Amino acid sequence: MEPATVLSIAIGSILLVITGFAIYTAFGPPSAQLSDPFEDHED
């Protein structure tokens, strides 16, 4: 394959992995450890 094709596939794969990990962190089991700054601060 051409180097440009391999590079495009590699960059696309990396972006998909980063997006999947971000969604897992935001909505999966690790989200229980995230704090909400609006709930922590009381007026």
Swiss-Prot record:
UniProt key word Thylakoid: yes
Role played: May play a role in photosystem I and II biogenesis.
Membrane spanning residue stretches: 7-27
Name of protein: Protein PsbN
Native source organism of the sequence: Crocosphaera subtropica (strain ATCC 51142 / BH68)
Cellular component GO terms, alphabetical: plasma membrane-derived thylakoid membrane
Pfam families: PsbN
One GO-annotated biological process of the protein: photosynthesis
Membrane topology: Single-pass membrane protein
Family of the protein in this entry: Belongs to the PsbN family.
InterPro entries associated with the record: PSII_PsbN (IPR003398)
Localization in the cell: Cellular thylakoid membrane
Gene: psbN
Keywords of the record: Membrane, Thylakoid, Transmembrane, Transmembrane helix
